[in-house]
């Protein structure tokens, strides 16, 4: 059980001063001072007791009485010595707690008041009395029910107006009122209504068979409707002014459901009707316009009919239908009631009245629900604003908070150091005697060592005696970095001639030179967290002075200042032919991109003149032919580089390339290459630098420019090799010092940048690196014997975390300043199997304290802790391991090694094949291949290590290729899944696929209340707030789950596999494999909280080198939930754990795409293709990004 308490600081010096000042006072003052202090202390204690809620949980007291920091405490700061920042952080923590309580209360209020009545409409229809009476909703009633006022009700017999005795012709005619009479515009005919004016566009729904309009024409008028229409037409030919005939014609056209012709007839009927009979035509027209969806016009006509008619039933009923359709429910009900007064018990009016009342009350209830939902929406928006504010405050909190992984590492290192001191005592450097029978140790302290071939003859250990160690071999180095046996003790490093001795050292102080040449790891991580993009790398200018030609300032001294500030113009001088390959690159240099290094060089070369003054002088020199023209064009190119005008710079440099003498062509070649590289054209720059090296191979500017090309292409190993070659040149280079900070960080801390050596092929020989200046600092091969003293902070060996990153440092153990170098050629390990096995067993005997992974001499092991140090000769190494930078084996050197636990690797003759992108390929036999499974695009396994170097760069496409390239929708999330088979785990050994299922289906359940630890990543907001994330699920992974164990058992349904996982997970909650499978199940189901619960459980129990399996799933969930920062964090962790898996690189690239970090996404798609050059999805996405950037003309190198 732990107890939380608060720690308060006081200023000890102030208290001491107060106490010393009070000594000389009288006893009264002493008593007053003591009483005041006691009173203040009492008040302070009472205040603490009165406010227990303000106590923080930064410090805890463990069960064994130890006081320690909590790993996930927000008060673990990057700068723990900063008291003010600590207090501000505590205030921010308390504020966030209050804000969190407010958010929770606000969310509860929203949920309690949220209207979740989804069955309102159905319940209303069942419970409302009007709805029950109406029997059906208003929408199911025919509100276009046809009505008319019969002529018989006007005491008019239609038979008297028709000739019923005449014979009928074979072709019956139809009454076309518009042709029979050309009616002038008449307001009395309501021709001003919009429905009448737009009669040609009138439409009408189909008539039901029961529509009353079919009874408007009496059967006595004819045997069929067409016969009646013919007789009406004949009658109108004889009497074209009869309002009765026009009304009959309108009845005919209403039956035919042709509203345009009906309007033509009814308008003429209105024109000729007497006032007392106009209601017949008005009701007719109202029905026609109502059915044609001009209900507002129909209402006007129906009201006009009410003023004239005696048939109130028909007019009110018609008007009620019209108002119901218009949504004027109150008017509609009033009209239906008037109709019922005219004819009580009229069922059609009664049902419609109740249906209208039912609909009116339903809409009122729906409007009330809408207002409630709108209020809830506004509250949610306000909640979102508060939540965003909370996240911003959390970001400010995390800004100063120490990264949890780093705090865990510090705790591990501390615990390891404490364990070493407890178990092995204080550590010291011991040496083997010349006869190899004794060990000489300076202190009488316990010594432990492993017996082996080199020291099995040791019979005793001699303590404290002064011995000469110049020719002895350092066997054990376990010197504690926190202790020293004398105040004067310090580490010394044997140094030869200083690296980069000719590189403008006079411009830097000793401290600056020391900081640049011997950087600390923390400085490198802060200054260069990643390899800078091409436009941020230093650029170089190869000056003519390197060929003993006239310098720029000498050429400019002979020229008088020009009267006007002109710019150098190279476009009209010595025009280069159209076949120049550099001409096609000018479009890529259109964007303004200043080169600060070029501006600095030009300022120094021009004697302090301003940029504009220098440009004017160069322009005047070009016009007056002062000096060789190609040299001035070279200087003009430098000017335009400083101005950021790449197009003009390229024009000048092309002219210089065309006119320069062959022996001096490397000057414009190198300068042009630096221009192109600054704009990201690293492939083209590489080609120009290769041409320059053919002319002069000993020019450091050329080599360092080539270093930048390799860096921009991601070839860090190649960059280091060329950098060593440049260091070996004893040539003055005033600009070269700009490359030192980054390159020295790459040399000393290669694993900070994921730098790895490619393994030699089995049949080929490894290239032996030449001796260079780089090794002088660690081998002490120079005869000068100069030494430098390093403090413990700057010494890499004092930082145990550096050893965790597999870095090696060399410390001179004898102080002589001299040591013999050994051949660094890597020997093939074809016949040394027995020695390697003994070598491995010796490493295996070491014990450890924490987890990791290590690959040494082709054997894989689990890293379990750190043990300081064994000399390579003691360990039996033969130089076959990875080597970066300083590779010489010094007999007096100490090496950081690791304690490992051996893991046997399964033997296989060949890896499984993979299918992707429409073709099938069987990979070459290799023991290190891993099979990856992924849903979305199929992710193949990486090929053998010999094939990795086949891919260098995809390059940038041209406009034609972009037009041909199939574009990929980058907003589509490709779900990824790292199968446990990639970790050589057989899933059928964990899940029972053979036993038939008898019981009903169940779902896997993980421990949702698993305590937070250093492994569960609860410091991420997505994990801590997993119950509130918006996760839509990844149903595309269903097939992956169904095919688990497909090699041995047939595919099963999704529910069956979930049940099998649930059965075994219930018995074994500590299996990270089963927890990962359960998380995959919940990813398919779309339940993010349950999936994260299972992934927390998997992360808690998984070994470190297996954690990338749940981390990839977690990254996909965060990306789906749009928690991109969290997704980025866990995806990076997965890549760091297993950088050789394609799926990890591809997932990280996808996260950067979602964040619209296109250049970073391109980098990781490139790294994906380096692992698997034929992987189509990465190629397609990379091409899509490139074409998008090119279309914006805003390209920078990846």
Curated annotation (Swiss-Prot):
Segments forming a coiled coil: 358-399
Keywords, in A-Z order: Cell membrane, Cilium biogenesis/degradation, Coiled coil, Cytoplasm, Cytoskeleton, Membrane, Repeat, TPR repeat
TPR repeats: 313-346, 630-663, 700-733, 1071-1105, 1108-1141, 1142-1175
Positions of transmembrane segments: none
InterPro entries for the chain: TPR-like_helical_dom_sf, TPR_2, TPR_rpt, TTC17
Region Disordered, annotated ranges: 771-792, 814-839
Pfam families in the cross-refs: TPR_2 (PF07719), TPR_8 (PF13181)
GO annotation, cellular component aspect: actin cytoskeleton; cytoplasm; plasma membrane
Bias type Basic and acidic residues, positions: 821-832
Keyword Repressor (UniProt): no
UniProt record, GO biological process: actin filament polymerization; cilium organization; determination of heart left/right asymmetry
Consequence of gene loss (knockout): Morpholino knockdown of the protein causes curved body, a lack of defined brain structures or necrosis in the developing brain, and eye formation defects at 24 hpf. At 48 hpf, show a reduction in number of ciliated cells within the olfactory organ.
Localization: Cytoplasm; Cell membrane; Cytoplasm, Cytoskeleton
Entry similarity comment: Belongs to the TTC17 family.
Function: Plays a role in primary ciliogenesis by modulating actin polymerization.
The protein, known as: Tetratricopeptide repeat protein 17
């Amino acid at each position: 059980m732990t107890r939380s308490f608060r720690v308060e600081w006081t200023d000890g010096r102030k208290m001491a001063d107060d106490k010393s000042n009070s000594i000389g006072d009288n006893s009264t003052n002493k008593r007053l001072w003591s009483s005041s202090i006691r009173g203040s202390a009492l008040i302070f204690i009472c205040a603490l007791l009165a406010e227990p809620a303000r106590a923080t949980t930064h410090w805890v007291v463990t069960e064994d009485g130890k006081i320690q920091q909590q790993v996930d405490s927000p008060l673990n700061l990057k700068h723990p010595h900063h008291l003010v920042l600590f207090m501000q952080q505590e205030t921010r923590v308390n504020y966030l707690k209050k804000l969190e309580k407010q958010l929770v209360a606000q969310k509860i209020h929203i949920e309690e008041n949220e209207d979740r009545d989804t069955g309102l409409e159905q319940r209303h229809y069942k419970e409302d009395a009007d709805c029950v009476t109406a029997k059906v909703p208003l929408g199911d009633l025919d509100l276009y029910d046809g009505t008319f006022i019969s002529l018989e009700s006007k005491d008019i017999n239609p038979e008297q107006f028709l000739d019923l005795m005449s014979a009928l012709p074979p072709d019956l005619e139809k009454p076309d009122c518009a042709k029979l009479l050309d009616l002038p515009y008449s307001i009395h005919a309501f021709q001003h209504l919009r429905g009448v004016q737009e009669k040609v566009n009138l439409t009408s729904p189909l008539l039901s068979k029961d529509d009353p309009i079919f009874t408007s024409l009496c059967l006595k008028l004819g045997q069929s409707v067409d016969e009646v229409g013919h007789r009406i037409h004949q009658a109108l030919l004889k009497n074209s002014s009869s309002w009765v005939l026009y009304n009959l014609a309108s009845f005919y056209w209403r039956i035919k459901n042709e509203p345009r012709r009906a309007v033509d007839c009814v308008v003429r009927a209105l024109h000729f009707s007497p006032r007392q009979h106009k209601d017949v035509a008005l009701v007719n027209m109202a029905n026609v316009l109502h059915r044609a969806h001009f209900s507002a016009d129909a209402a006007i006509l129906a009201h006009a009919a009410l003023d004239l008619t005696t048939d109130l039933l028909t007019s009110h009923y018609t008007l009620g239908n019209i108002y119901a359709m218009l949504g004027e429910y109150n008017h509609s009900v009033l009209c239906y009631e008037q109709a019922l007064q005219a004819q009580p018990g009229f069922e059609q009016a009664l049902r419609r009245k109740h249906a209208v009342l039912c609909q009116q009350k339903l809409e009122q209830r729906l409007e009330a629900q809408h207002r409630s939902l709108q209020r809830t929406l506004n509250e949610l928006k306000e909640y979102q604003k508060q939540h965003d504010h909370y996240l911003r405050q959390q970001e400010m909190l995390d800004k100063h908070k120490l990264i949890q992984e780093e705090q865990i590492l510090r705790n591990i290192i501390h615990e390891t150091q404490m364990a070493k001191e407890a178990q092995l005592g204080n550590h010291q450097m011991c040496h083997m005697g010349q006869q190899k029978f004794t060990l000489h140790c300076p202190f009488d302290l316990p010594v432990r060592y492993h017996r082996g071939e080199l020291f099995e003859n040791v019979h005793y250990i001699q303590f404290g005696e002064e011995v000469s160690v110049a020719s002895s071999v350092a066997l054990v180095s376990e010197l504690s970095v926190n202790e020293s046996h004398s105040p004067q003790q310090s580490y010394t490093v044997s140094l030869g001639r200083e690296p980069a001795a000719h590189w403008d050292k006079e411009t830097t102080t000793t401290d600056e030179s020391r900081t640049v040449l011997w950087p600390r790891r923390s400085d490198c991580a802060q200054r260069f967290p990643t390899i800078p993009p091409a436009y941020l790398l230093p650029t170089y200018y190869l000056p003519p002075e390197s060929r003993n030609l006239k310098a720029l300032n000498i050429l400019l001294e002979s020229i008088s200042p020009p009267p006007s500030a002109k710019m150098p113009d190279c476009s009209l001088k010595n025009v280069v032919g159209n076949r120049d390959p550099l001409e096609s690159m000018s479009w890529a240099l259109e964007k303004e991109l200043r080169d600060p290094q070029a501006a600095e060089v030009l300022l120094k070369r021009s004697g302090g003149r301003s940029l504009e003054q220098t440009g004017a002088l160069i322009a005047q020199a070009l016009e007056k032919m002062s000096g060789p023209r190609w040299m001035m064009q070279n200087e003009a190119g430098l000017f335009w580089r400083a101005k950021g005008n790449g197009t003009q710079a390229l024009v000048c440099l092309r002219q210089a390339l065309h006119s320069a003498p062959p022996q001096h062509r490397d000057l414009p070649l190198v300068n042009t290459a630096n221009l192109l590289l600054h704009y990201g054209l690293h492939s083209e720059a590489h080609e120009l630098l290769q041409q320059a090296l053919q002319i002069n191979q000993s020019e450091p500017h050329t080599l360092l420019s080539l270093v930048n090309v390799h860096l921009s292409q991601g070839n860090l190993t190649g960059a280091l090799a060329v950098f060593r070659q440049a260091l070996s040149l004893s040539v003055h280079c005033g600009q070269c010092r700009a490359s030192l900070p980054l390159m020295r960080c790459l040399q000393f801390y290669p694993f900070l940048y994921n730098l790895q050596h490619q393994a030699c092929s089995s049949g080929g020989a490894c290239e032996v690196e030449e001796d260079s200046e780089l090794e002088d600092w660690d081998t002490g091969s120079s005869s000068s014997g100069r030494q430098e003293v390093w403090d413990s902070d700057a010494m890499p060996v004092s930082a145990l975390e550096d050893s965790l990153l597999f870095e090696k440092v060399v410390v001179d153990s004898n102080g002589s300043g001299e040591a013999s170098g050994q051949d660094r050629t890597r020997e093939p390990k074809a016949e040394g199997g027995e020695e390697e096995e003994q070598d491995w067993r010796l490493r295996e005997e070491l014990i450890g304290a924490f987890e990791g992974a290590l690959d040494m001499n082709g054997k894989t092991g689990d890293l379990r802790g750190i043990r300081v140090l064994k000399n390579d000769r003691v360990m039996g190494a033969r130089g076959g391991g990875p080597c970066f930078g300083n590779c010489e084996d010094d007999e007096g050197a100490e090496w950081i090694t690791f304690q490992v636990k051996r893991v046997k690797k399964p033997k296989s003759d060949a890896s499984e094949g993979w299918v992707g992108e429409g073709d099938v390929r069987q990979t070459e036999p290799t023991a290190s291949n891993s099979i990856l499974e992924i849903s979305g695009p199929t992710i193949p396994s990486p090929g053998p290590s010999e094939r990795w170097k086949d891919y260098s760069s995809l390059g940038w496409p041209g406009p034609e290729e972009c037009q041909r390239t199939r574009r990929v929708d980058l907003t589509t999330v490709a779900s990824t899944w790292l199968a446990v088979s990639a970790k050589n785990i057989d899933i059928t050994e964990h899940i029972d696929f053979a036993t038939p299922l008898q019981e009903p289906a169940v779902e896997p359940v993980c421990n949702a209340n698993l305590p937070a630890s250093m492994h569960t990543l609860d410091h991420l907001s997505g994990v801590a707030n997993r119950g509130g994330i918006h996760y839509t699920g990844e149903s595309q992974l269903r097939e992956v789950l169904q095919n688990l164990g497909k090699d041995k058992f047939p595919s099963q349904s999704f529910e069956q596999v979930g049940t099998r996982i649930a059965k075994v997970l219930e018995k074994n909650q500590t299996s990270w494999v089963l927890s990962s499978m359960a998380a995959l199940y919940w990813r398919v189901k779309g339940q993010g909280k349950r999936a994260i619960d299972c992934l927390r459980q998997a992360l808690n129990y998984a070994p470190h080198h297996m954690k990338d399996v749940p981390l990839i799933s977690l990254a996909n969930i965060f990306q789906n939930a749009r928690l991109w920062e969290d997704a980025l964090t866990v995806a990076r962790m997965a890549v760091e754990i297993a950088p050789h898996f394609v799926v990890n690189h591809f997932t990280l690239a996808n996260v950067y795409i979602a964040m619209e970090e296109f250049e970073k996404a391109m980098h990781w798609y490139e790294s994906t293709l380096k692992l698997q050059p034929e992987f189509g999805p990465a190629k397609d996405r990379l091409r899509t990004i490139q074409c998008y950037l090119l279309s914006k003309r805003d390209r920078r190198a990846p």
